[in-house]
Amino acid sequence: MPSQRLIKCLLWVDSSRKTLLRHLVVLVLAWCGPAWGQASTPAGLWQTVSDRTGQPGGLVRVVEVDGEYIGTVVAVFSPPAPDPHPLCNLCEGDLKDKPVVGMIILRGVRRSGDSYSTGRILDPDEGQVYKCRIALLDEGRKLEVRGFIGIPLLGRSQTWSRKE
């Protein structure tokens, strides 16, 4: 009965192909799964929004350098600064009277597990440096930036929107 043998052989090959295909799908998903599940990082271009006025304040480019997130002002467009090239008049030390555009305002933030360590943020409007914490929200489309003195409870937050 060669036809029964042939049918059994074809069924075995067919089931082997299905099994092989299942194994390949599982392997691909296992390999790609971590990439799909990775959270966004704070690196990117962010539009700041004033926590006092609710108006857009400018753009900050956040980059990762040796595990540290650093934020640099790339544009200022909020109304209390009619000057398109405002200076940090209230800053102290080397930053006194320097252009706000190009100024590093965020530094020292590092990834720590699923969150980010405390860093420092400069408020160029006040010339003050605060401790800060950041948190990604809305699947990485928003960044909560909390500046504080002492403990996070004694501070204020801004929510920045990702531009790229």
Q: Predicted regions: what is each one?
A:
Residues 32-34:
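N-terminal signal peptide c-region/cleavage motif recognized by signal peptidases
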Residues 36-45:
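N-terminal helix-cap/turn-to-beta initiation motif at the start of protein domains
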Residues 91-97, 144-151:
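Short aromatic-glycine motifs in intrinsically disordered, low-complexity regions
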